[in-house]
Amino acid sequence: KPNPAEAIGLDESYSRRKSYDHWSPNGVLVKNLYFHAEGRLSFSSPDDGSASAFDSFVSDPDNPVPFSAEIRTTQGHAWMVEDQRFAARRPDVLVYESEPLEQEVLIAGPIIASLQVSTTGSDADWIVKLIDVYPPDAPDNSPRGKQVRMGGYQMLLAGEVLRSKFRSSYEEPKPMVPDEVTQIDFDLRDKYHRFLKGHK
């Protein structure tokens, strides 16, 4: 009897499964994505001259960013793929998008987001999301009989929250030094997802 696969990935774009003897799959290339000016996201690293560039926002604890566009007491069944445009429109949310993809991109394995951040206070909550942005002409979808406009849909793939003081340890919280740039790493967990051509 053959050994079971170490991992089975579901490629929802083509409704097919693929078995892998090793995870992360052998042959996967480790690629970095970089923030650029004007909300751009690219596989190319920024020029040296932009190393000191930064984006900023004002966070109001009395007006936090909700996890859902709907008012609900539970997460519901669809929150992990909910359209994120409700958050992207807010002035206290930074959004970075790639150009429309010229070819498909399959991600398979762990995702780490490494941020250089500072705050005027001694603590802050940081939220990082990985989103698949559909093209404007994407056909509509009708899950469970409900019509969903998919043009420009921002499908949530991963999202993690981290309070600054727990960036190194939950057992020994460490406050931020106001206005001092500090590195914070987010583990967005392993993902298996195909970004189709034309998506961002």
PLM features per residue range, with description:
Residues 1-200:
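C-terminal, loop-rich substrate-recognition/catalytic regions characterized by aromatic stacking residues
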